[in-house]
Each structure stands twice: as C-alpha cells, then as structure tokens.
Amino acid sequence: MTNTKILEDNISFEEALKELEEIVKKIDNGQESLETAVNSFERGIVLKNHCEKKLKEARLKIEKITKLADSTVVLEETEI
C-alpha cells in the first residue's frame, strides 16, 4: 500500500490498527529497503492519527452519553 493513498474516513479503527501493527512488524523486521521503510513509516503516522481521531470521537460520545444518563430522571408510574 502506498502512502499516497488517502485514508478514507470509513476505514474502521480496527482496520487501521491492524494495518499499523503490520507496518510496525515490517519495519522491526529490518528487511525493507530504506525508501520502503520511510514510506511505511509515513503511512503509519497517518494511521496513528486516524486511530487517535477515532478514539477521541468514541471518548466524546461516551462522555455525552454518560452526562445524559446522569441528568435523566426516571419517573415511575404511581397507582391511583
């Protein structure tokens, strides 16, 4: 995969993380050429940023849900 490929917003966190892990393994292996390793590293940075964005979005959503749950009052029906 080339680093010129634009990371689409619809790539899932899990897909991005898996690709990032594969890149780390390839670089750690040390069998790639310098140019390929640099390109892989660049792609890894894009994937890392994407994962951080997805995590931030999830954290904000959880905070919003938690605040909503904390402020919701549940009224029980009473028998008359």
From Swiss-Prot:
Main subcellular location of this protein, as a coarse class: cytoplasm
Catalyzed reaction equations: Exonucleolytic cleavage in either 5'- to 3'- or 3'- to 5'-direction to yield nucleoside 5'-phosphates
Subcellular location: Cytoplasm
GO biological process, one term: DNA catabolic process
GO cellular component, one term: cytosol
Top-level lineage group: Bacteria
Coiled coil: none
Keyword field: Cytoplasm, Exonuclease, Hydrolase, Nuclease
InterPro entries (UniProt xref): Exonuc_VII_S, Exonuc_VII_ssu_sf
GO MF term set: exodeoxyribonuclease VII activity
EC number(s) reported in the record: 3.1.11.6
Function statement: Bidirectionally degrades single-stranded DNA into large acid-insoluble oligonucleotides, which are then degraded further into small acid-soluble oligonucleotides.
Quaternary structure annotation from Swiss-Prot or TrEMBL: Heterooligomer composed of large and small subunits.
Protein family (similarity comment): Belongs to the XseB family.
HAMAP family, A to Z: Exonuc_7_S
Protein name from the UniProt record: Exodeoxyribonuclease 7 small subunit
Gene: xseB
